[in-house]
Structures are given as C-alpha cells and as structure tokens.
C-alpha cells in the first residue's frame, strides 16, 4: 500500500520526537514497522525529500552496478543499502543482485527490448554497418563495462587496504 508524503513524514517525526517506539508508531499510523524503519533510514540519510516517491525512478547501469557491488561488499542489510542509495524498495536491490549473480554486469546493460540480442565481439568489422541506435547501444555497453571495471577495481583496492590494515593491527598487538 502506498502512503502519502504527509503520512510518512508525520510517522517519522512522531518516532524521532521520541513519542513512541517503531512498533507503536507503526500501529498508530496503521503501517508496517518495516516500512517505517525504512522511511526513518531514508529521512536520516537524505532528508524529508527522500520520503516523496511520486516519480517513477530509473537508474543507469552504472548506478545499479555500484549499488550491487556495495551491497555484496558490505555487511549491511538490503533495506539499509536501499536507504543509503535512496532507493524506495529493498526489493529493487534484491532483484539487481539476483540479476548480477545470474548474468554479471550485462544484467544492467540490456534494455527489455534488447534481452534477446547477443553482443558481437567482432565490432570492428561491423562498425561500418551499424545504425545510430546500435552505436548508442554499443556505447552504453562499453560505458557500463568501464564503470563495472572501475567499481571492481575500487572494490578490490578497498579489500586490499582492509587486509593490510588488519595485518598492521595484528603485528602491533
């Protein structure tokens, strides 16, 4: 069930003012405590505008990949990851992770109409015959692939930094 911005804001403010706990506040406003918890996280991370979900959002392949890599590389819950990236539902993140595990970064590149298409590796031969739409799709694919590689490199570097930090701490002890 969708709730208005006003109801969300009133429930969050009621809880944050200390009038009641999450479960009591959820009962008072007749909503689920998980939704309220998510709204509180959104509000605390992004302010009141994050509670206004009137517009259907679309996310770039780079954004999706960034969220998935963050979720897989950190031990935060999916609702917390969704709140961190201002995504209205943790199920969106869950679906992105499923797609990523099934198809890798290509899960985010394909549009619904393009799902049956396969990417050709002999692009140099086909470049002269490509339509502008195919060129745009190729560019989108290469950008997403580049973003994926950069994100993966950053993820691996961060992991390496953490390992080095652990070694330093254990050698000092």
Swiss-Prot record:
Protein origin, superkingdom: Bacteria
Region of interest (Disordered), ranges: 115-135
Pfam families: HTH_28
InterPro entries per the UniProt record, alphabetical: Homeodomain-like_sf, InsJ-like_HTH, IS150/IS1296_orfA-like, Trp_repressor/repl_initiator, WH-like_DNA-bd_sf
Alphabetically ordered keywords of this record: Transposable element
Transmembrane segments: none
GO molecular function terms listed in the Swiss-Prot or TrEMBL record: sequence-specific DNA binding
Family: Belongs to the IS150/IS1296 orfA family.
Designated name of the protein: Insertion element IS1397 uncharacterized 20.1 kDa protein
Organism of origin: Escherichia coli
Species classification: Bacteria, Pseudomonadati, Pseudomonadota, Gammaproteobacteria, Enterobacterales
